[in-house]
Amino acid sequence: MRKRQFLLVAATAMGLNPAQAQQNLQADRVGLLVLHGKNPGGPRDPNIRSFALRFEREGMLVELPDMPWSSRRYIDGHWDRAMEEMDRHVATLRSRGATRIVLMGHSLGCPAALAYAVRKPDVDAAVLLAPGHIPRGYYEFANLTPVRKSIDEARAMVAAGKGDERAAFNDINQGRSLTVRLTARDYLSYFDPLSDAEMGVSAARVSASIPVLTVIGSADPLFRLAKSYVHDKLPPNPRSRYLEVTADHLTTPEVARDQVVAWMVQALARV
């Protein structure tokens, strides 16, 4: 009952017909694939875990897996492996009874959500919370040159036929320098500005039928960039929204939680 009351209030706030919203709730089972941020992120990160559990308490089906960029796995294999893992998690949600699939990414989970939506356009919506991981920015912005050097090094290794050799490469997460060991080919799958791990690349390729909510916090390092870097590259969809909240990179999911639920009611409403 609490779930229906909450979502019906949200439907009313969004100007939707409450009776129609209730009918939709009875007909649909929403499955959420929640994708955490990059190392030190992971499924136990309280900033995303409490957010995901709220949706579970509302009666939705939730998967919050340990992805290849977590603190435990950082970074485990090629970007394609991450997409394959997401495929299995979506299949799990469907096997549990989900009839609608929503991808929710935080930080690096955002480019993963976009890339998956490009490959699997049968998802119903995507939520980008504090979008992070910017291969084009890593390559072009003067303060991120250590990553550019690693991208050039990895490209040279691939060109020399050494793409499957492991090496130490640079990464930067929220201003913190990181070192990651993986093959040059796998590194480029995450960091090449032309790869689909680059949000600007994937956003433009998302099906126009998929509504996307982009949420950015006022204290996020990408606050002034997120709209033009990601959201404005999405194809037009009348249900897509861009939302600014008073939060930093880590607290954005929790701060935006109720607004995300309200948007989902609108985005998933059947016409």
Regions found by a protein language model. Give the residues of each.
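Conserved alpha/beta-hydrolase
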Residues: 56-72
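Short beta-strand/loop motif that positions the catalytic acidic residue
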Residues: 214-216
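Active-site nucleophile loop of the alpha/beta-hydrolase fold
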Residues: 127-137
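Short, surface-exposed "cap/lid" segments of acyl-processing enzymes
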Residues: 27, 32-55, 67
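Conserved alpha/beta-hydrolase "acid-adjacent" motif
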Residues: 221-227, 252
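Alpha/beta-hydrolase active-site loop
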Residues: 76-95
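Catalytic active-site module of serine/aspartate enzymes centered on a nucleophile-bearing elbow/loop
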Residues: 247-271
